[in-house]
Amino acid sequence: MSTSHDLPAVDRLTVGTIGSPGERTFFIQASQGPRIVTLKMEKAQVAALSQYLGRMLAGLSRPGHLPAAAELDASDPSEWVVGTLGLSYDAEADRVVLVIEEAVAEDDEGATARFGATREQVAALAIRGAQLVEAGRPPCPLCGYPLDPEGHACPRTNGYRPPKL
């Protein structure tokens, strides 16, 4: 079993990528004091998390000054792969709590990570996540699959000719 983490008041919370568009690997990273936790995510998870955080924050009072977008510390290796994400708001502590569960086989028990972050930190996370997702390859206007710089075999054209852009 992987290691579980509980960081009730993170100093830094960010999402980031390693690699070029089309070959990027997405990560979420949190730190509290000297402790850094890096977890691997899917692009769709980053997109969903960013969208949900935006909707969640819209229902709360406006956050204060947003911290500068934190860069991913690529020297810290990923500990495990994210399976499910959950969010809650602790009104007493004025913290958004991210609960992340490890992706494991059905019969296995996975690790859990809990990150408590300020509204400002999660607002910055939502913005950065949306920017990273948008920075990927543009979608094909016909099929929606990503367009590669070296070409695109579009299923809507049976792969015979590239779509006219």
Positions of PLM-derived features:
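Short, well-structured hydrophobic secondary-structure segments
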Residues: 35-81, 88
